[in-house]
């Protein structure tokens, strides 16, 4: 009887251990998600979570990725600084679990190469394309304020990266605010000139977020996920030529475009959020509320994953 009881206990414990890893991990990424793309191509998540089936879903930007996360069709994703702020303001239940710091070089305000506009201040009254609720939204707001302008001083047209590129090339907008690799692609092909980037504007970086139900059910897996992302990032730093070639082939981009993007990236490691990250993100959220761009104040700290 004792042996039967012991076997039952061992079976239960084994079941709990197995439950610590999800049966499926659904990952949302963008063309800008270097670490995720490399992790996918090198099957790093499959190695880190051997009992887990990994599914990859590509998105054109952070806002649609957030929608998928909220709709229950995604577990984790990589986004810029503004999508999670908009998500919190909309009552979406997600958690920040890691950050990839940047230096503000991976996104820019672009104008046509032949444009007479030489400064952000000269965009007053002009039409500017960007994706609403994206990191480009933040870059442009801060760029305007630095130039002494207000949001109302320009005519912002909300467009996806692909539609923004088309409008930009057709002369339907005077400027386009976008992130890499779209930014590098427009500059490399000679159609765009950089009016300004995010340097000096205290960018918070890009974030890795998880749906709260997943975080609550599999908190032990988050550490392994962060380590895997950090490993993928190290590959991009330690093997840049190989990583550039792989990214170019995988995403269908010119190697010169990916090389430019890599040159804009920060070597800072992917890691759990620290007080400085939360503080930067909170100041950005407060700025968006003060400018009427989100409907209510948000508390960033409330959405930060707490490791068990």
Summary of predicted features, one role per range:
Residues 25, 125-130, 173, 213, ...:
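Second-shell loop/turn segments in exported
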Residues 42, 66, 70, 81-84, ...:
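Extracytoplasmic/secreted envelope proteins and their assembly/folding machinery
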Residues 216-293:
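Secondary-structure end/capping motifs
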Residues 14-16:
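N-terminal signal peptide c-region/cleavage motif recognized by signal peptidases
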Residues 82, 153-249:
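Pocket-lining segment of extracytoplasmic ligand-binding domains
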Residues 21-150, 156-158, 174-178, 194, ...:
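Short, glycine-/small- and polar/acidic-enriched structural segments
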Residues 286-308:
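Conserved C-terminal helix/tail region of periplasmic/extracytoplasmic solute-binding proteins
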Residues 1-6:
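Bacterial N-terminal signal peptides that target proteins for export
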